[in-house]
């Protein structure tokens, strides 16, 4: 499917290769189709040979004789000029010369006509030679290879199966060896079969190309060019249109086939690999030991009931007898077990189509392993007689069938399939179709497809009952030349029969046979000649659900009729009947789960090239019904079935940039593209657009009305083909478009239509506005009809979402239909009830679940359509709500919705009756009244509380109107800009009327009960809720004032920032740079300052206080601790000896030494302080000097490595600098 812009998987094409699948399993359908195609090739070559012989031996000779006779005739048409040249005519001067010129010119004209008739045999021969060399000859080579391996495989298989197990020399190893040899031949046969399918596809497309080129050659000779003016005259203009279509189809098909080359190759490889896995012989030698096979090993007693009916199919050899006297032979039959039915297919005597035998329910059979048979891997199927089946009188005896499989595993699988099927049938319901099928026997539906083989067993298992018919007699048809089916006096090809997945001699008859049948629950020969033997049920498409019926039992419970003629209505033409049979055969019949074919009638079909993307193009046949477009695609043996629901399409447009191209758009804007061929693409677009419009209205037209409309369209299309002026065509297309739009707008989706003019409606609206308290209105870019469907359609969720007091999270939203009701005056109205849960505070109090249980009671909003003028005016009332508020009378709240077309004074609505306006106005009117709960009278004088309450109610009404606008904006954004009315109808539903009165809401009966009693309120506000509302409003006001203050403050700051941003930026940058530099310099100068400051502070702390006296005596030995420069070294032995000898003498000078020591302490402290001060003065400079030296050393060590390593003195100097620098830096603690 063509997909542009969204979700490629949603429209992804699902291609299947029916031909490759049938070739991989070597089915009878495959063999019949390739044999029938060979007969077509032989017929084509015979036609070519006969045509060439006729052209060379008869046509050329006859043409030359005719040309000479023609020249003789032309020379004698007029008297010779010489005869008239001697006074024989009056105009002696010009008549003889005029005759001579006329004879020459007329001769040239005649020769041109003869050349057109003769044709260009050289160009035609070139196209024919290309066909033979590029398609026919390669096909012949592939076919020769196929015939060789098919014959070899069939003969080896027959020999392999014919081995007698009674031979004493038969060993499992020899059987295994034969099986492996057969497998090697089967692999070559499989490859040849797949290659043959590809070759057949190439021949088909090449033949189309040859026919196109031949037509072009013949058409080119029909162009006559005048001698005098050189003007070209087309002698056959009617050929141009369909020849151009054919050329487009051939060119695109060839281009598409090249794109599919890789897919074809992958499909062949996949089929080859899968089949090899399936047919590979077992490597276990015990599987070939015939004498070890026992029934107990083949069937397990613990076989479980399968979840669905088992399926099994394949070739088996069947034992039968022929001739008189009878002799035993073994023949191949394609056997199948499906849906609890066992049956057989076989090739016809001509081997060009598939035939069938009777089908038997599994409970009419008894299956067992047959060890008595002198062949390997045999089993017996015993079919019971009419003890169970009373419908077949010629079945009086039981029939015993003996089948032979090719290997042990295949034998086991067949026996298990029968056993599992019986268990499955017994586990299902006994009134189901599958259960009934298991006990029935079915004869072939038609004589033409029944087995015509004369063997004894085939005749026993092929019977006919009163339901078996002859298609030739019933349909009045026959097979004519080239095996073409003739229906009455018309050839079937005149009904545009499409290419089926499988083509056999009886394919066209099989398609027509669907006229006499309605589906099948099991395989049959009709389906095998169209779709092959494979079950493609999972790939089919149906219009609705419920593919599997529960029961098909008839009244007597014994008969299951499987034939039922299709009954077409009287208005359905014969051509449409044949097209409908094609449609159902290609689209629905492959589904073997169907009780009967869907009863959808085909309305028209068209051929197209379906374009899923920019590269791929598939040849497609599109079948259109009232509700769907079904597409059957067949390109290079790839089949695809898909459908498009018309309910998903909103518009069909002809692509102006590409001729013959249609674009289909769905509601989301998804685009599908198709190139329409062999039909007027504008006519197809008109038909599809009409079906879309018909689908959108409330009461769609019937098939008969649609076909009548299509006939009118076709007649108009034929008339328009005669028109050549572009201006007239444009006007007609505009009129057609206007008419189409008018029909959409005038479709009656309500049950009545009124016709008031615009001024009356406008005056009515003005009068209503004076009667209501307040009116809110808003303009929308959509027609009034579309807006009405958005708000009041039965699928719209606008209500109760638009109601101010409705819970927005309620689960009551759903379809709410309108139903007829009568008002007080007896007039009909449309009424509906919308349930919703009440939420009295949720829209203005964030109180969470406060009083949620009490506030969430279920109430109903009743809407009544008061007046409708379709497409112009819609008036809907909402029944009043009664609200009870403390200290106030009962408040009655009435709401009216009015939708009108936008009124323009310059363009009155009555002059645009056939066109809908592009915009409309929504008016919401509110009326608030206080009434006496007892009398129901309106209160005129309001109290202060009632005035305040009314003010609040009007404020909340405005909030509700804003909510309505928000909901409408959501729907309009979802609808988009195009096709608004149709999208609104599809999205939001229609103003539908219930046909069943029992579906009316039960609350309608109770709706008027409160009118008869005293006035009751719907909504009650308690004092607590009002208090919360008051507190909430106060908080809201305070919060607003706070936010206003902060807003002003932020505004001032922003203003200052704006003013500051206008200052010179360079000045700001300079100031910032100056500040940074000053910070760095002050940091550098502050370090020594604060060091001295700390020293001074320490000094004053130590000595500056008068209240603190510190005395310390420092002796010679103590002074060594402070300074080694002011005393004798401590390790001086002479001084030590002196100290020991004079120790006693020192005591008498102790006082004097003490004073000296104290003085010494003072002097040392002062000296140390001075030393530190002096050191601090030079510390920074010295550190800076050391840093520079260290940097220089580092630079020399990096940039002058030779100098650095050779100069040890420099290295020592640098190391000393590093050490000194480390000493100056304080240690890290």
Curated annotation (Swiss-Prot):
Arranged from A to Z, the UniProt key words for this protein are: Endoplasmic reticulum, Glycoprotein, Membrane, Transmembrane, Transmembrane helix
Which residue ranges run through the membrane? Answer: 1067-1087
Among InterPro entries, the record links this protein to: AH/BAR_dom_sf, BAR_dom, PH-like_dom_sf, PH_domain, Sip3/Lam1_BAR, Sip3_PH, VASt
Per the record, ranges on the Lumenal side are 1088-1229
User: The VASt domain covers which part of the protein?
Assistant: 771-976
Q: Which residues are glycosylated?
A: 1206
Annotated Gene Ontology cellular component terms = cortical endoplasmic reticulum; cytoplasm; endoplasmic reticulum; endoplasmic reticulum membrane; plasma membrane
Localization, UniProt = Endoplasmic reticulum membrane
Q: What is stated as this protein's family in its record?
A: Belongs to the SIP3 family.
Write out the function statement from the record: May be involved in sterol transfer between intracellular membranes.
Cite the record's note on assembly.
Interacts with SNF1.
Q: What does the UniProt entry state concerning the protein's domains? A: The VASt domain bind sterols.
Q: What name does this protein carry? A: Membrane-anchored lipid-binding protein SIP3
């Amino acid at each position: 499917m063509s997909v542009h812009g969204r979700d490629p998987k949603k429209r992804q094409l699902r291609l299947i290769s029916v031909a490759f699948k049938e070739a991989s399993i070597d089915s009878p359908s495959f063999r019949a189709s390739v044999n029938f195609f060979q007969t077509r090739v032989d017929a084509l070559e015979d036609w070519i040979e006969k045509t060439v012989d006729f052209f060379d031996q008869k046509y050329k000779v006859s043409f030359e004789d005719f040309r000479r006779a023609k020249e003789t005739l032309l020379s004698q048409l007029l008297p010779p000029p010489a005869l008239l040249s001697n006074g024989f005519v009056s105009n002696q001067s010009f008549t003889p010369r005029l005759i001579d010129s006329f004879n020459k010119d007329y001769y040239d004209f005649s020769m041109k006509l003869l050349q057109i008739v003769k044709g260009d045999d050289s160009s035609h021969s070139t196209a024919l030679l290309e066909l033979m060399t590029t398609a026919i000859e390669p096909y012949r080579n592939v076919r020769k290879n196929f015939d060789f391996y098919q014959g070899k495989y069939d003969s080896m298989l027959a020999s392999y199966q014919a081995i007698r197990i009674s031979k004493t020399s038969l060993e499992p190893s020899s059987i295994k060896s034969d099986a492996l040899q057969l497998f090697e031949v089967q692999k070559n046969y499989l490859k040849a079969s797949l290659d043959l399918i590809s070759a057949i596809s190439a021949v088909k497309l090449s033949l189309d190309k040859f026919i196109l080129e031949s037509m072009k050659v013949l058409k080119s000779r029909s162009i006559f060019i005048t001698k005098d003016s050189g003007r070209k005259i087309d002698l056959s203009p009617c050929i141009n249109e369909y020849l151009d279509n054919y050329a487009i189809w051939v060119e695109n098909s060839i281009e598409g086939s090249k794109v599919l080359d890789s897919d074809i190759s992958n499909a062949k490889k996949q089929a080859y690999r899968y089949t090899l896995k399936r047919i590979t012989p077992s490597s276990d030698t015990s599987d070939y030991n015939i004498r070890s096979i026992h029934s107990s090993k083949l069937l397990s007693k613990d076989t479980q009931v399968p979840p669905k009916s088992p399926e099994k199919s394949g070739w088996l050899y069947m034992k039968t007898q022929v001739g008189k006297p009878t002799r035993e032979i073994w023949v191949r039959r394609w056997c199948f077990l499906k849906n609890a039915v066992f049956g057989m297919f076989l090739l016809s005597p001509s081997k060009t189509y598939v035939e069938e035998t009777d089908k038997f329910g599994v409970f009419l059979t008894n299956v067992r392993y047959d060890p008595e048979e002198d062949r390997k891997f045999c089993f017996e199927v015993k079919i019971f007689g009419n003890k169970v089946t009373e419908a077949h009188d010629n079945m009086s005896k039981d029939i015993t069938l003996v089948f032979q499989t090719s290997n042990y595993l295949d034998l086991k699988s067949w026996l298990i399939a029968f056993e599992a099927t019986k268990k499955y049938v017994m586990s299902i319901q006994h009134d189901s179709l599958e259960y009934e099928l298991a006990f029935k026997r079915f004869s072939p539906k038609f004589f033409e497809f029944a087995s015509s083989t004369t063997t004894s067993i085939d005749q026993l298992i092929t019977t006919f009952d009163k339901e078996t018919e002859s298609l030739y007699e019933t349909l009045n048809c026959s097979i004519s030349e080239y095996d073409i089916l003739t229906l009455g006096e018309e050839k079937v090809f005149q009904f545009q029969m499409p290419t089926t997945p499988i083509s056999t001699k009886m394919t066209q008859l099989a398609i027509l046979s669907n006229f006499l049948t309605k589906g099948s629950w099991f395989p049959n020969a009709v389906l095998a000649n169209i779709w092959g033997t494979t079950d493609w049920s999972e790939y089919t498409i149906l219009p609705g659900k419920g593919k599997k019926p529960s029961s098909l039992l008839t009244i007597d419970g014994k008969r299951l009729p499987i034939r039922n003629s299709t009954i077409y209505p009287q208005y359905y033409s014969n051509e449409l009947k044949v097209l409908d049979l094609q449609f159902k055969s290609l689209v629905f019949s492959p589904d073997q789960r169907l009780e009967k074919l869907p009863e959808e009638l085909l309305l028209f079909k068209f051929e197209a090239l379906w374009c899923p993307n920019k590269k791929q193009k598939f040849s497609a046949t599109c079948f259109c019904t009232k509700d769907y477009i079904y597409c059957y695609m067949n390109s290079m043996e790839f089949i695809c079935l898909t459908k498009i629901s018309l309910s998903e399409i909103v518009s069909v447009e002809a692509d102006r940039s590409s001729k013959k191209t249609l674009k289909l758009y769905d509601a989301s804007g998804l685009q599908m593209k198709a190139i329409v061929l062999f039909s007027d693409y504008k006519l197809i677009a008109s038909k599809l657009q009409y079906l879309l419009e018909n689908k959108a209205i409330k009461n769609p037209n019937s098939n008969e009305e649609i076909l009548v409309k299509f006939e009118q369209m076709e007649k108009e299309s034929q008339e328009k083909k005669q028109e050549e002026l572009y201006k007239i065509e444009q006007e007609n297309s505009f009129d057609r478009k206007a008419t189409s739009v008018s029909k959409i707008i005038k479709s009656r989706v309500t049950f009545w239509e009124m016709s008031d003019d615009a001024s009356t409606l406008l005056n009515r609206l003005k009068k209503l506005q004076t009667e209501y308290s307040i009116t809110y209105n808003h303009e929308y870019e959509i027609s009034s009809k579309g807006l009405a469907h958005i708000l009041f359609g039965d699928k719209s969720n606008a209500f109760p979402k638009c109601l101010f007091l409705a819970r927005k999270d309620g689960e009551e939203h759903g379809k709410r239909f309108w139903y007829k009701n009568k008002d007080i005056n007896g007039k009909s109205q449309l009424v509906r009830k919308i349930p919703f849960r009440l939420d009295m505070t949720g829209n203005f109090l964030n109180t969470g679940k406060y009083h949620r249980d009490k506030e969430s009671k279920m109430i109903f909003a009743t809407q009544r359509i008061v007046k409708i003028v379709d497409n112009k005016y819609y008036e809907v009332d909402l029944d009043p709500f009664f609200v009870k508020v403390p200290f106030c009378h009962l408040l009655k709240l009435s709401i009216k919705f009015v939708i009108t077309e936008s009124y323009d004074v310059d363009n009155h609505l009555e002059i645009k009756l056939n066109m809908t306006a592009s915009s409309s106005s929504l008016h919401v009117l509110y009326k608030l009244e206080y009434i006496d709960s007892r009398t129901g009278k309106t209160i005129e004088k309001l109290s202060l509380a009632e005035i305040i309450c009314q003010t609040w109610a009007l404020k909340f009404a405005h909030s509700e109107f804003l909510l309505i606008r928000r909901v409408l904006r959501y729907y309009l954004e979802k609808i988009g800009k195009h096709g608004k009315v149709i999208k609104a109808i599809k999205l939001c539903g229609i103003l539908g009327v219930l046909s069943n009165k029992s579906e009316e809401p039960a609350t309608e009966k109770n709706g008027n009960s409160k009118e008869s009693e005293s006035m009751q309120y719907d909504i009650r506000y308690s004092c607590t809720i009002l208090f919360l509302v008051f507190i909430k409003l106060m908080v809201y006001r305070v919060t607003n004032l706070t936010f206003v203050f902060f807003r002003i403050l932020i505004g001032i700051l922003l203003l200052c920032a704006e003013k500051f941003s206008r200052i010179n930026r360079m000045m700001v940058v300079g100031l910032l740079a100056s500040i940074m530099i000053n910070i760095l310099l002050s940091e550098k100068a502050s370090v020594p300052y604060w060091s001295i400051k700390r020293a001074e502070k320490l000094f004053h702390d130590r000595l500056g206080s008068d209240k603190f006296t510190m005395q310390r005596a420092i002796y010679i030995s103590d002074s060594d601790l402070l300074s080694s420069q002011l005393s004798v070294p401590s390790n001086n032995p002479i001084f030590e000896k002196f100290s020991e000898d004079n120790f006693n003498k020192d005591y008498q000078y102790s006082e004097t030494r003490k004073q000296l020591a104290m003085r010494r302490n003072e002097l040392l402290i002062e000296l140390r302080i001075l030393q530190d001060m002096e050191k601090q003065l030079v510390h920074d400079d010295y550190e800076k000097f050391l840093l520079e030296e260290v940097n220089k050393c580092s630079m020399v060590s990096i940039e002058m490595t030779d100098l650095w390593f050779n100069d040890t003195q420099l290295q020592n100097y640098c190391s000393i600098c590093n050490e000194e620098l480390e000493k100056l830096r304080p240690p890290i603690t």
